Amino acid sequence: MLRAIGLVYIVIFAGIIVEGQALVGPAGISPLGIYLAEVKKLLPGTIEAFFGAPSLFWLGQGAGLIAGVAWSGLAAACALVLNVWPRLALAVCWTVLLSFVSTWNKFSPAQLDGLMLEAALLCLPFAPPGIRPGLGVMSPPGPFVVFTLRWLLLRVMFESALVKLVSADPHWRNLTAMDVLYETSPSPTVLGYWAHQLPHAAHVLAIVFTFVAEFVAPLAAVFGGRRGRWFAFLVWSALQIGIQLTCNFGWLNTAALGLGFLLLDDRMLASAADKLGLRAASRFLARHATAPALPPTPPTNAASAASTRGANGAALVWQRCGRYGLRAALAVHFGLTLFHFARVCRLPVEDLPPVITRPEKFFAEFRSANGYSLYANFEPAHVQVDFEGSNDGGKTWRTYPYRHVPQQVDRRPPFTAPWFARFETTIEIESSKPPKSSVIPLVAAHLLARNPDVMARFASDPFPDRPPTVVRMRRHRLAFTDPATLRRTGHYWHKEFDDDFLPALHVTPQGDIAQFDLTAAETALHAGSFRTAFALFERDYQLGNLDAGYHLADMHTRGLGGPVQPEKAFALFADLAARGEIRALHNVGLSYEHGLGVAADLTKAAESYRRAAAQGRMLSLYALGVLAATDRLVPKNDIEGLAFLLRAGAMATGTDGAAAFVREEQPAHVKRLAERMSAADVAAARALALTPR
């Protein structure tokens, strides 16, 4: 088990060595020095500040120290795997990981890092003492030490089951969790893609198996004797292997699998080896399952005996103090874990007297007594921000390619676990969390500044010729395609544009990095100062702000500050559409449909609407459905038209005017189409509406 912990720590520190400078280095996204300065402002006292962020980096925040600390952690992890001074190695692993985890804020998922911190701390007294202790037969861990580690495993299992039942997320209770788990996990594998395609009944069986592994297995381990522990070990291991092969949750499942070996003892392993015909292994394990006899004590004279008794007496006192101190520390840790267990059970822990809750708050930032709620909640969709740059004023855009997480729709989902892509996973998590994260625009700023550490987190530099002057942050929704689509197109993912996460960043004429801000232009527009508004919009459009260009086209369309100029509006909309502005692409379709500034052409109208609809534009879906209902869709296809209307209606859930309009008008067009279609065609349209395109 200790070797497994060491292997996981090797993966952790290798990741920190690779990504640490980009994340928290002096020139990184969230520099340690800035973070610790903020902690110092909030907690002026030295001791208070340390307990607010327990870290070696109070000694310094330079790139050399960050690298040195990370490499020392890797060396300690290697020593643990090689069984060299395991207690010291565990202490170094815990100290180094805590130093990073307590200072890099959003780059530390609580479940992953917290589990490894708690495991390392509890393994300290479990590991045998000495530089080369072998299997530690001469100094086996005490019963309370073994109990605390098994208590950790049982909490990981049982709390994860319990939180699924009491969580506000209904997916586990209504047996639909596995219908969404694979698709919404940060980086599913190709096996996750195929698991997603299984029928709902298979997903229900997977849910039942999950609860057996997390709820029944710990009870069997506690009350079922050795057979119960074998059962718990096997189903728990199968669950962790299955999740790791389908979902890529970093080292989480590897660590949970390693902890599962705590359910076994040498006698159980010896018996299993014997039944499997592994005689040598069986004899070896049986030998070490029994404590060796102590060597005989040589005869001594009275003087030396008295001296020995004195020395032994002092040693016994120290041993007792150490033993009682360890028991007290483990008892405190056990008490702290009860707070987290109570929270999972939704008990009112915060209502307890401060004298009881104070220790838990005091040690909270050490993150070594935790609650575990694995896979309790699900995001409504797989959402991700892509960084796109332009070096020609927004005429063309190039995407910064990620290394691991889904982005290219035709890329086979890879196997990356136990490696944890901390940078990419953080971007994905922050893409959908309210309020909008400050991490994402900081990454965009570093890309404009050509920070080599941050740029190295991407698979390649899309601007080897000339650096970008604008970087935008475009949010997309991703959904798995079905096998038929995969065979036809080679696409594993369907990707829809959602919105711009924040206004784009650009390099000003003075060489500074700034965020596009249309406040002044919009204020002038609302005040009726159309000439001023036009000039401000035009300036930002020339810098690459497509939103400013859309305002310009809208002013031409409505005749604000001059006559209505549909030709100029269409030219602007067409230019914006070519640059990837989805609203403008819809308006190009509108112009072709109604002959606004261009000759009417229903074929080109449908083409533009389809391109916008493929990127998730609700109004374009609705427009295509209306064309079908009014017999103007080219080519004619009532099944597709009804599917467009149904998809538009499903998307019209917001409070904005466009959503309200679709909700009001869509039913009449649906009725009109459905009345002239056969029942089979209507069923086909409904199925098509539910299929990612």
Feature locations, PLM:
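Alpha-helical membrane-anchoring segments
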Residues: 1-517
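Hydrophobic face of amphipathic alpha-helices that form TPR/SEL1-like repeat modules
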Residues: 517-524, 536, 549-558, 572, ...
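Helix-turn-helix repeat elements of alpha-solenoid scaffolds
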Residues: 525-531, 565-566, 601-602
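Short helix-capping/linker turns of helical repeat alpha-solenoids
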Residues: 525-529, 542-546, 558-560, 578-581, ...
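TPR/TPR-like (Sel1-like) alpha-helical repeat modules
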Residues: 636-656, 687-690
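Terminal, low-structured helical/coil segments at or just beyond the last alpha-helical repeat
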Residues: 657-693
